[in-house]
Amino acid sequence: MIVIKDAHFLTSSSQLFQCPASLTSEMVILGRSNVGKSSFINTLLGKNLAKSSATPGKTRLANFFSTTWEDKENALTTTFNVIDLPGFGYAKVSKSLKKEWEGFLWELLSVRISIKLFIHLVDARHLDLEIDKNAKENIQALLRPDQAYLSLFTKFDKLNKNEQHRLFLNAPKPFLINTTHFNALSSKYPTLEIVRQTLLKYLLTNPL
């Protein structure tokens, strides 16, 4: 069982020199505006730390959170950072992710050696948006051998049972979701515990 021993806000950065020192592995959370990024982070960490922006697209800040997870089964305690990036795709005409994030944010993703895992949140109701395809391509083009990219589907509980099953069958594995009520889902779908275990496994594969 994974227990979140600590989770707290570190800092917000708009320039590289403002970012915390790269002393521990880091997980980046990215996704379109209104995809449910804050909800996912708060569910994952068991604490209301991430706030939704009142003006999507206006603030180009990266928010850093320090977290400590205990894997009781394996008697392992790990500290790492979660980086919450601003939502993309807020413009009426979607630009490329690289264009929206040119400057600080793109530089952060390109050069920060402590980033080990990218979690791309995708709205389960809107699977084929160009901006998400572009984001996936851009992030995968950045990946170093010691980094991983995973998709995670938000708003899974907004789908009917047939839609949930179809997504489960066709989505890339590992199949990861966020939902308001994990316990209300069929047992074939991942629980919050499984989501945490999966993310921790990827982070520990290539420690800093």
UniProtKB/Swiss-Prot annotation:
The keyword GTP-binding applies. Necessary for normal cell division and for the maintenance of normal septation. GO terms for biological process: division septum assembly. This is Probable GTP-binding protein EngB. GO terms for molecular function: GTP binding; metal ion binding. Pfam families: MMR_HSR1. Belongs to the TRAFAC class TrmE-Era-EngA-EngB-Septin-like GTPase superfamily. EngB GTPase family. One of its GO terms (cellular component) is cytosol. SUPFAM superfamilies: P-loop containing nucleoside triphosphate hydrolases. Keywords: Cell cycle, Cell division, GTP-binding, Magnesium, Metal-binding, Nucleotide-binding, Septation. GTP binds at residues 31-38, 57-61, 84-87, 154-157, 182-184.
